[in-house]
Amino acid sequence: MATVPQSTKDDLERRLTARARTGWPQVAGLRVRHRGAFAWIDAELPNGEILPLIRLRYLGSADDWGFGLYLASSGKYEDQILPTGSFTGTPEQALDCACELYLMAPDF
């Protein structure tokens, strides 16, 4: 399993923070944790609540990551298919997918 280079870790945090700022005003900040080939991303909401969102798996490219969604029902991350139909994609696609599920109010 590939270890994520420090430059890629830094780039990942920069990219996700920029995407959250422009696309998800409900997110006050992101917390990114790295271990081995994985990165876990949590959203910090304006009220201070921490919301686990995604787990990314480094596949050797800064633009193509495996995607796991946090499932509150089990407290675990499970590999998922992105809206593009792929199991892999950009970090921004993964963040958008999770935020659409967890932060958007349903239209009834």
Describe each model-derived feature in a short phrase.
Residues 1-11, 69-108:
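Mixed-charge, Lys/Arg-enriched low-complexity segments
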Residues 1-48:
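Negatively charged, low-complexity tracts enriched in Asp/Glu with abundant Ser/Thr
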Residues 17-19, 23, 61-73, 105-108:
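Hydrophobic transmembrane alpha-helix bundles
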Residues 42-44, 50-69:
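Short, conserved beta-strand/beta-arch hydrophobic-aromatic motifs that form part
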